[in-house]
C-alpha cells in the first residue's frame, strides 16, 4: 500500500476526540482471541523507513518512541487508549511528540495469572520459548506496521487493530554433540503455582558414545537465554555469506569471523588434545527475565536450589558426569559473570572454581555509578547549584549515549511493577523483598530515582556478593580459596569495573586464608572482556568455552582427592 493510500485510510478512521488532543486506540478482533486478555499494550512510533518498529525500541539515540498501558480483561473490540497522560519514552507524553509522518505498530504483551505458593496472586508474562522478549514472544498480538501522520494538537483518535499474532518458535533439533534437556522443577512449580520447567543445552565431548565407561567433569556456562549452543559449528564457514559489519567493534564481515571462530571451536573440541568434559548452558527464563540469576529470590523463586539440587543432578546422571565438587566449574560474562561468582559463593562446595567476566554489579556501593548505601538519588548527582545526570552507557572513549534515567524510564514504559523484562527490573526482582502486592519492592522510585534505604539494606544482606564474602569470610574463605577469578575491562560500557575494583580491594586483604585467586583488567576494554590480554575483545568474547580450560585442569590436578577418577575421561 502506498504512503498516500495509507494516510488516506487512517484519515477515514480518525474521529473527533472529546477529551482534546490526539488519542491512539488499540483493539483486537475476536478472530485473534475470543477471550478477554490481560497484559501491556505498547504503541511504537518510528521514523525508520524500514523494519518493524517493535525491533527499534532501545534507550540510546537510535531508539524510537514508545508508549505503554496496562490492560486487565481487555475484550475483543474494546480499546486500550494512549493519550497525553500516558507515560512514554523518549518523549514522556504523546503531547510532546513532534507533528509529522511516522510508522506505527502496536503490540499486546500477554500476561497470565499466577496463584503463587506464597499466597500472592500476580499477573506476569510467562516465557514461551523466546527467552522473555516482549517483541518476539509467541502468542503476543501485534499490528501490521503502517504509515501515519501524527499531530498531537489535533482532536482525533487514531485506531490501530492488532491483526497478527507472533507464531510459536520451533524447538531446535539435537545433534551428535548438542542435546536439549527440559525437566519440570518441583520447587519452582510449588512457588509459581503452575508447572514450571528448567532446561539445559548440553555440549557432549568427542567420543561420548564410544567410551560408555567414561565419567566427565561438568562445566556450567552461565549467561542470557540460550536457544541452543551458539558458537559451535560443525560445518566450515559459508563462503557465500554476505558480510555483516559490526559497528560496536568497528570490524567488517564480523559474521564471517563468528562462523570461523565457531568452526575453530568445533575442531579444537573434537581434536585429540582437548580435555573431555561436558559443558551445559542453563535455560531458566522466567516471568521476569530471560534468566533467573541462578539464586533463590523472594520474587523470582527458588531458582538457585532448583538448578543446583534438581537440574544439575539430572544432567550429571544422564550424561555420565563425575558428580563431585572438585570436578565442577562455572564461568560466564555480564549476567553470567555475576551468576558464576554468586553460585560459587552461595554453593561453595559445589564448584571448584568460577571464572566471572564483566560481572553485573557484585558490590552495591558501585551499582553501576550508584552507591545504594550513600547516594540519595540514582538518576542525579545533586549539588547546591546544579544536578548532573548519571551516565548509564558509554563507549570505549567514554562518550555517553544513555543515562540511568533513560534506561529506567524505558523500562517503566515497557512494564509496570517490574514487568519490563529488562535489566534493572530483573535486578530488582532478584534482589528485593516481595512487596505487599506480590511484586518486587522498588530499590528506587522509577520516575524520580529516589533510593529506598530499607530495600537497599535488604539487598546488602542477601545479594551484595562482596559484602557477603566479607561478612562470612571466616566460614566461606576456606571454601573459596583459589576458586575466584574476576575479569573486567576498565572501560566497561556499563561501568561494571567499579564494583570489581571494590571486590579486589576486599579480596587482597583476606587472610586465614588469602583468597589466592585472580583479578585482572583489560586496558580500554569494553563490556565482555574476559581475560585474554593478547586478543581484541571482538575475538576473545567468542572463545569463552576454551579460555579457562587450562586453569580448570590445573585446579583438578591440584585439588582432586586421592581416589578421584582422573583417567576415564582423558582419552
Model-identified regions with their sequence ranges:
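Sec/Tat signal peptide C-region and signal peptidase I cleavage site
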Residues: 15-21
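Non-catalytic cap/lid and distal C-terminal segments of serine-dependent acyl enzymes
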Residues: 46-571
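Short beta-strand/loop motifs in extracellular/secreted proteins, especially
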Residues: 22, 39-41, 51
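Short, ordered, surface-exposed loop/turn motifs in non-cytosolic proteins
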Residues: 34-47
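Bacterial N-terminal signal peptides
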Residues: 6-15
Amino acid at each position: 500500500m502506498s504512503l498516500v493510500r495509507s494516510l488516506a485510510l487512517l484519515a477515514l478512521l480518525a474521529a473527533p476526540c472529546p477529551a482534546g488532543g490526539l488519542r491512539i486506540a488499540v483493539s483486537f478482533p475476536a478472530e485473534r482471541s475470543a477471550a478477554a486478555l490481560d497484559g501491556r499494550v505498547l504503541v511504537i512510533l518510528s521514523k525508520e523507513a524500514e523494519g518493524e518498529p517493535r525491533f527499534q525500541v532501545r534507550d540510546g539515540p537510535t531508539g524510537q518512541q514508545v508508549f505503554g498501558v496496562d490492560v486487565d480483561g481487555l475484550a475483543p473490540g474494546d480499546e486500550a487508549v494512549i493519550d497525553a497522560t500516558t507515560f512514554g519514552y523518549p518523549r514522556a507524553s504523546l503531547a510532546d511528540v513532534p507533528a509529522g509522518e511516522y510508522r506505527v505498530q502496536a503490540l499486546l504483551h500477554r500476561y497470565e495469572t499466577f496463584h503463587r505458593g506464597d499466597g500472592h496472586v500476580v499477573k506476569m508474562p510467562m516465557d514461551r520459548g523466546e527467552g522473555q522478549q516482549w517483541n518476539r514472544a509467541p502468542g503476543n498480538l501485534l499490528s501490521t506496521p503502517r504509515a501515519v501522520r501524527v499531530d498531537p494538537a489535533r482532536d482525533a483518535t487514531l485506531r490501530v487493530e492488532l491483526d497478527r499474532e507472533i507464531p510459536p518458535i520451533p524447538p531446535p533439533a539435537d545433534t551428535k554433540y548438542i542435546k536439549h534437556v527440559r525437566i519440570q522443577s518441583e520447587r519452582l512449580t510449588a512457588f509459581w503455582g503452575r508447572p514450571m520447567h528448567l532446561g539445559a543445552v548440553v555440549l557432549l565431548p568427542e567420543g561420548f558414545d564410544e567410551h560408555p565407561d567414561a565419567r566427565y567433569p561438568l562445566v556450567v556456562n552461565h549467561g542470557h537465554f540460550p536457544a541452543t549452543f551458539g558458537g559451535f559449528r560443525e560445518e566450515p564457514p559459508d563462503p557465500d555469506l554476505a558480510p555483516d559489519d559490526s559497528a560496536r567493534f568497528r570490524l567488517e564481515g564480523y559474521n564471517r569471523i563468528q562462523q570461523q571462530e565457531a568452526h575453530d571451536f568445533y575442531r579444537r573440541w573434537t581434536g585429540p588434545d582437548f580435555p573431555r568434559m561436558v559443558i551445559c548452558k542453563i535455560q531458566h527464563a522466567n516471568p521476569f527475565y530471560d534468566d533467573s540469576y541462578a539464586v533463590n529470590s523472594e520474587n523470582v523463586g527458588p531458582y538457585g536450589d532448583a538448578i543446583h539440587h534438581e537440574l544439575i543432578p539430572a544432567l550429571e546422571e544422564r550424561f555420565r558426569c563425575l558428580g563431585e565438587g572438585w570436578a565442577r566449574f562455572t564461568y560466564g560474562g555480564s549476567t553470567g559473570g555475576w551468576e558464576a561468582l554468586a553460585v560459587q559463593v552461595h554453593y561453595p562446595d559445589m564448584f571448584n572454581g568460577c571464572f566471572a567476566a564483566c560481572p553485573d554489579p557484585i558490590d552495591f556501593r558501585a551499582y553501576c555509578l550508584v552507591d545504594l548505601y550513600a547516594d540519595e538519588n540514582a538518576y542525579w548527582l545533586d549539588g547546591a547549584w546544579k544536578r548532573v545526570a548519571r551516565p548509564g552507557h558509554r563507549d570505549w572513549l567514554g562518550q555517553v549515549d544513555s543515562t540511568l534515567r533513560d534506561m529506567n524510564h524505558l523500562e517503566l514504559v515497557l512494564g509496570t511493577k517490574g514487568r519490563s523484562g529488562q535489566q534493572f527490573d530483573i535486578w530488582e526482582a532478584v534482589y528485593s523483598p516481595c512487596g505487599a502486592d506480590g511484586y518486587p519492592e522498588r530499590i528506587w522510585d522509577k520516575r524520580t530515582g529516589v533510593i529506598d534505604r530499607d530495600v537497599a539494606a535488604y539487598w546488602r544482606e542477601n545479594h551484595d556478593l562482596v559484602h557477603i564474602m566479607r561478612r562470612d569470610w571466616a566460614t566461606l574463605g576456606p571454601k573459596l580459596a583459589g576458586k575466584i577469578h574476576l575479569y573486567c575491562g576498565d572501560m566497561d560500557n556499563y561501568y561494571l569495573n567499579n564494583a570489581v575494583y571494590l571486590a579486589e580491594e576486599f579480596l587482597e586483604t583476606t587472610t586465614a586464608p588469602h583468597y589466592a585467586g585472580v583479578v585482572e583488567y583489560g586496558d580500554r576494554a569494553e563490556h565482555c572482556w574476559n581475560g585474554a590480554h593478547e586478543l581484541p575483545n571482538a575475538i576473545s568474547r567468542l572463545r569463552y568455552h576454551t579460555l579457562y580450560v587450562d586453569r580448570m585442569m590445573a585446579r583438578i590436578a591440584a585439588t582432586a582427592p586421592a581416589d578421584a577418577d582422573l583417567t576415564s575421561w582423558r582419552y
